[in-house]
Amino acid sequence: MRFTALLIFVFVCVAGYSQSFDTVQIRAIKLTDKIHMLKGSGGNIGLLSGGDGLLMIDDQFAPLSEKISKAIAGIDGGPVRFLVNTHIHGDHTGGNENFKQLGVTLVAHDFVRDRMMKESVNLRTNATNPPRDKAAWPEITFADRMNFHLNDEDIELHHFTNGHTDGDIVIRFVKANVYHVGDLFNRTSFPYIDAGNGGNFSGLLVNLDKILALIDDNAKVIPGHGNLATKADVNAYRDMLYELHDNVAKAMKSGKKIEDIPALNLTAKYDDVFGKGFIKGKDFILIVAQAVAAEKTEKKTKK
């Protein structure tokens, strides 16, 4: 009955949207007997199923809630009890209102709720975004660490520092050795550092170091976007970012200015893999250059 109610509710919501989501299919990938990864349009969804109720991680866009719900029902007909947001962005939280309508409890970092309650500015486009509807706000929030014990699984929620945004979290399924890391790791694009929502490139590097210290070689890693990954994939991504950071730092030390950096084509060998996504190589390397300049200023200030 709960899923039937959701389908009715979502049908009303979807009617007000563009039909661009009509062709999207939600595909469920089984990781363990109780954990699935769902792919569609937007951020990857994680799902823990079992008799205690379902725990869902991220919910993509509002017009997809009906399709997501059908996919979940095909895995486990039980109710979704908890919905965890990995961060604030709408391609991960767009369905919050729809699922909350059914009494699903929303969980996120403190900063996610704080930012949803306020007007924000997209620094890439200078567009002003109004506060999210109250129905989208998380009801349970935390600062650094939170634990769930559900369906004979121990689930850890970790917040390390600002990275992609200031509210990014990593979800660890301890017994299953499965991790959902949100957009701290994106297999389809160079990183988007959302400074308007507290993002920080240097902090992203710290986050990746922390993630790699947490996981082992047998772990299954759900990225924010793209296919299921391993520790080796995360390590390669982290190494790429450090390499680009160091190459930018060398160029600027030799006299190059921030605006000179994109013309150096420092991302060229990675563009085929990461340069076709949301953030292009020349846009990303400019973010890195700004971060390097900020690090240099900070060092001078501390002297």
Residue ranges and their predicted role:
Residues 1-19:
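Bacterial Sec-dependent N-terminal signal peptides
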Residues 51-52, 63-107:
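Active-site metal-binding motif and surrounding structural segment of the metallo-beta-lactamase
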